[in-house]
UniProtKB/Swiss-Prot annotation:
Attaches a formyl group to the free amino group of methionyl-tRNA(fMet). The formyl group appears to play a dual role in the initiator identity of N-formylmethionyl-tRNA by promoting its recognition by IF2 and preventing the misappropriation of this tRNA by the elongation apparatus. It comes from the Bacteria. The keyword Protein biosynthesis applies. GO terms for molecular function: methionyl-tRNA formyltransferase activity. Belongs to the Fmt family. NCBIfam families: fmt. Keywords: Protein biosynthesis, Transferase. Its EC number is 2.1.2.9. Signal peptide: none annotated. This is Methionyl-tRNA formyltransferase. CDD domains: FMT_core_Met-tRNA-FMT_N, Met_tRNA_FMT_C.
C-alpha cells in the first residue's frame, strides 16, 4: 500500500489551519475540508470565513460547511469522498458514530494535552490554571466519547513559568503537526500501536467562562497568578475598583507576608500594585482600564493613583 493517504480534514480555527498547512506540504492528498459555517466577526459583524476555509480556498480544495453532521444527506458528503482517514483538529462539531466509521482507517484527532489528563474543551488553559509542569499533544483514534479514544502518539512540552495560554497555544500548534505526520505514516505502514487511556488518570478541562475571569482574592497569590496566565488572551482576568473593571495582563507572586484582608492594596509604586490575598501577595504589573490600551502599573498610577491608595479594597 502507498504511504500517501486520501485525507478529509475537519477543523476551524488557526490552530487547525496550521495542521492543514503541514498536510498540504506532505505526500498526502487532501480530498476535502470540513469547517464551521462563516460567522459574523469584527466591528461590522461581517460574515467571515474560518482560517481553515481561507487556506483550503487558496489550494482549491473542496470545502463543506454543514451546520451539523447528523443529517443523512450531510453524512453522504463524507462518504462520497472515499477517504482513507479523516483528521479532526478543533472542528467544533460532533461526529456521529456512522461518520467515524466511514473512512477506511477511521478518524483521528489532535488534542492539546497529554491524555487522559484534560479531556474536554479547554486543555491548554486548564493546564496553566492547575500549575502543571508539562503538557503536550496527543493524537488519538476517535470514538463516540469525549476525547476517550485510544492514544496513537504523544509529544511532551514543558510549561515555563512565564507561559500564557497564547504562548502555549503557539508551542502546541508547532508540535501538533509534527505528531500528526508521524501518526499518519505509522497508520499508512500499519505500525501504529494504540494505547488505551487509563480512566483512573482522567481529568476534565471545562470550558472557560467570563464569570470565572473575575479575580477572587480569597484564593492564594499563586493560584491567582496562574489564572491570569491561563485566561490570557481570553477571557482576561480582571478586578473592580471604583466600579470600574480593570483587566490584568501580568502579575507576579511576592514572598512578602501580610496580614491584611484579601483584596487590600498594601503598596503601589512604579514596580507594581501589591494586593493581599488569602495566602501571599500578588504584584500586578500590567493592567488595562476599560476603553484604554494595556499599560504598566507605573502609567496607570500616574493617571489614577486615587484608585490604589494604601488600604483600598479591590472587588
Amino acid at each position: 500500500m502507498s504511504d500517501s493517504l486520501r485525507i478529509i480534514f475537519a477543523g476551524t480555527p488557526d490552530f487547525a489551519a496550521r495542521h492543514l498547512g503541514a498536510l498540504l506540504s506532505s505526500q498526502h492528498q487532501i480530498v476535502g475540508v470540513f469547517t464551521q459555517p462563516d460567522r459574523p466577526a469584527g466591528r461590522g459583524n461581517k460574515l467571515t470565513p474560518s482560517p481553515v476555509k481561507v487556506l483550503a480556498e487558496q489550494h482549491d480544495i473542496p470545502i463543506f460547511q454543514p451546520k451539523s453532521l447528523r443529517p443523512e444527506e450531510n453524512q453522504h458528503l463524507v462518504a462520497d469522498l472515499n477517504a482513507d482517514i479523516m483528521v479532526v483538529v478543533a472542528y467544533g462539531l460532533i461526529l456521529p458514530a456512522s461518520v467515524l466509521a466511514m473512512p477506511r482507517l477511521g478518524c483521528i484527532n489532535v488534542h492539546g494535552s497529554l491524555l487522559p489528563r484534560w479531556r474536554g474543551a479547554a486543555p491548554i488553559q486548564r493546564s496553566l490554571w492547575a500549575g502543571d509542569a508539562k503538557t503536550g499533544v496527543t493524537i488519538m483514534q476517535m470514538d463516540v466519547g469525549l476525547d476517550t479514544g485510544d492514544m496513537l502518539h504523544k509529544i511532551e512540552c514543558d510549561i515555563q513559568p512565564e507561559d500564557t495560554s497564547a504562548t502555549l497555544y503557539d508551542k502546541l500548534a508547532q508540535l501538533g503537526p509534527q505528531g500528526l505526520l508521524v501518526t499518519l505514516q505509522q497508520l499508512a505502514e500499519g505500525s501504529a500501536q494504540p494505547e488505551v487511556q487509563d480512566e483512573a488518570q482522567v481529568t476534565y478541562a471545562e470550558k472557560l467562562s467570563k464569570e470565572e475571569a473575575k479575580l477572587d482574592w480569597s484564593l492564594s497569590a499563586v493560584q491567582l497568578e496562574r489564572c491570569i496566565r491561563a485566561f490570557n488572551p481570553w477571557p482576561v482576568s480582571y478586578f473592580v475598583v471604583d466600579e470600574q473593571p480593570i483587566k490584568v495582563w501580568q502579575a507576579q507572586v511576592l514572598a512578602t507576608v501580610d496580614n491584611a484582608a484579601p483584596g487590600t492594596i498594601i503598596h503601589a509604586d512604579k514596580h507594581g500594585i501589591q494586593v493581599a490575598t488569602a495566602d501571599g501577595v500578588l504584584n500586578i504589573t500590567q493592567l488595562q482600564p476599560a476603553g484604554k490600551k494595556a499599560m504598566s502599573a507605573a502609567d496607570l498610577l500616574n493617571s489614577r493613583r486615587e484608585w490604589f491608595t494604601l488600604g483600598n479594597q479591590l472587588a
